[in-house]
Amino acid sequence: MATQRSSLGQKAGWLYHESGISAVYSAGRDAWLLILSRTCRMFAFKAVTLTIAQFFSELGFSDFRIGLFMSLTLLGDVVLGLVVTLMADGLGRRRVLVAGGFLMAVSGAIFSVFENFWILLFAAVVGVVSASGSDFGPFRAIEESMLSHITTPKTRADVLAWYITSSSLGAAGGAALAGRFVENMTKREGWNLVRAYHATFWVYILMGALNVLFAFVMSNKTEAHHDDSSEASDELAEGLLRESMEEEEDARRRRQSMTSNPPEPASRFSSVSSGTRSVMYRLWFLLTIDSLADGMVSESLTTYFLDHKFSPSKTTLGNIFSSAQVLATVSTVFAGPLSRHLGLINTMVFTHLPSSISVLFFPLPSGLVLTVILLFIRMGLNNMDQAPRAAFIAAVVKPEERTAVMGITSTLRTLAMATGPSLTGGLAESGRFWIAFLVGGILRIMYDLGLWFMFVNMRLHSHETHHEESVPRGQSIDEEDVEMLRQSIESESSDEEHRK
């Protein structure tokens, strides 16, 4: 019996460490608050994603205006996120999170009361409303910088993985609750759909307030300039020789270089070498095609399409997208093992291509069941290419250029994605909503095939000195790639895990 208890204890200890829970626990209260903050926020984002297009339709907005709203909101979130991220370290990260949470609550309050298109658009662009369910505002980049700042290299990947996984589960909960909430509210006396949709934004007010509270109680350790350098400087000034000051200055510069301050936008492109550009031009072209397709068939628009075509109950609609979100979360766990066995490009193509085909055929079924199966295939496999893509970019780009390349990649993808909803809105208004899925599926398939033909034979790690020889066909990845795979798990979404 004692032996069995000892064996169970060892297994529990192994699971505790291997699951990353030990890393999250050791990271401390600030990390817990950051993880909880994003989980609550994604709960609200996904709850609104499920209903916002239907809400606008009930208000009498044209389909074109619905698409235009989503495009402008996405652009507004990106601009706000870029500006605030560049200023965050100077203003104070916690202050920025407090301001973001406040704007989120204010936006929720406006949406819960007003029905004018331009007032709602202003609230969505200036405030923090995610029409696509994506975390494109100022929060995520700052929170990831804070998590990286308060964790060690040994625990960082596990903490970031739980940060993403927890938020995905929160998003699934938001989708499930939103459908039930709307349906239950409409059964109450004096409540109609418009009033119920207004009420869903109460969750925005609540989660915004919680984000403010969490940011208030975080410690000064999360700030970019928090270290013990001032105390050390006092001690040195009292007793150490002047020549040691140069060493202190070098150490201070190294610490500053390790913080997550974003590079200046003007210097990003010029810092990328011509060799890297020759590779990235092709990849950027393909990623732009893929992002345009994603924008045309975003989750909000897909929900709107299902609601108009089949008119399922709001609870059913919520359960469908909640289950799809859980599938997407679970599938990302297998991205790393698949990449080690198939290679990065093969994993990206062989998982994303079935998802693209399901988008192409999505408008064809006349029954809800087959349509939902296609949706599950699409969302279940959709996110598995994100982590391998990040690892592939890291493998073909010089280490000192990765930050610039990642920044340019994110900007191009977002701009392309923002164009999509307006195109779909125009098609939907003319009674050709289904064409958006046809075009989106074709564009995604073009991306997949182009990716395979252009890059499957490319040698990886040619810029890294610790590899004795380059690796062809992406058939193996090293420990650095594995860590990046783990850190990249919704995304993109993420920033893509949620938006497709």
Language-model region placement:
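Symmetry-related core transmembrane helices of the 12-TM Major Facilitator Superfamily/SLC fold
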Residues: R195-F216, I435-F453
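Helix-to-loop junctions at the C-terminal end of transmembrane segments
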Residues: V79-R93, V182, S331-L344, A428-E429
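Juxtamembrane intracellular "pre-TM" segments in multi-pass secondary transporters
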Residues: T3-G28, H225-S291, H308, G474
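Structural signature of the two symmetry-related core transmembrane helices
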Residues: R95-I110, N346-F361
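Glycine-rich segments within core transmembrane alpha-helices of 12-TM secondary carriers
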Residues: A157-E183, L412-G420
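Hydrophobic core of transmembrane alpha-helices in multi-pass small-molecule transporters
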Residues: T39, S107, E115-P138, M146, ...
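Residue-level signature of mid-helix packing/kink "hotspots" within the transmembrane helices
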Residues: L74-L82, A171-A172, Q325-V333, T414-A418
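Helix-loop boundary and gating motifs at the non-cytosolic
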Residues: Y16-V79, V279-L287, S291-S322
